[in-house]
Amino acid sequence: NLQGNEVDDYMDVIEQYAKVENKEELRKGLSRLLYRQNEKLPAAKNPAQPDLADLLVPGHVMLAEVTDWKEAVSLGARPLLEKGLIQERYLQTMIRQILIQRPYIMVADGVIIAHAAIDAGVNETCMSLVRLPHKIAIHDYLQADIILILATVDFQNHLKALSQFNERVSEPEGLARIRRAADADALRAVLIGKEG
């Protein structure tokens, strides 16, 4: 197995010059990296991309009353952390990026997508969403009341769900229904297009 041999070669070099705290995690990370570089993405090898309903499962959609954006992002990440879908460092990286890089992450009026790199502690592609009663300042450069947390294991797996989300929030009436939803279940139903 060519890729396995490459991973072993990289492991040998790294271990010569660095103290490796967790060999198994390093091996997994190198395997993912090498696989991604060698991947040609043939359709047969690509499992179907999850849609929005697959990722925004019950318990991943919340209504909250917080005024601090870091608290809102942390709240959104909580179910993902509790299920082991992301690691704590993914949450910290999202917050640090907003603080330091001030990325433009707004996709519609008052709607932001908080995310970090695929190698920043993602175990499984996942999403969660927090809706606030009114817009709050996101590090004093954006205003948002809807925060989508996105984590993806590669550059493709989240695209279908993200496209569906963008469709929902890009139309004013869809956005209004998201803001009017009375509870988390109703909000999820609006988001995934299953409202009664």
Question: What is the predicted role of each segment?
Answer:
Residues N1-G196:
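Cytosolic covalent-transfer regions centered on His/Cys nucleophiles
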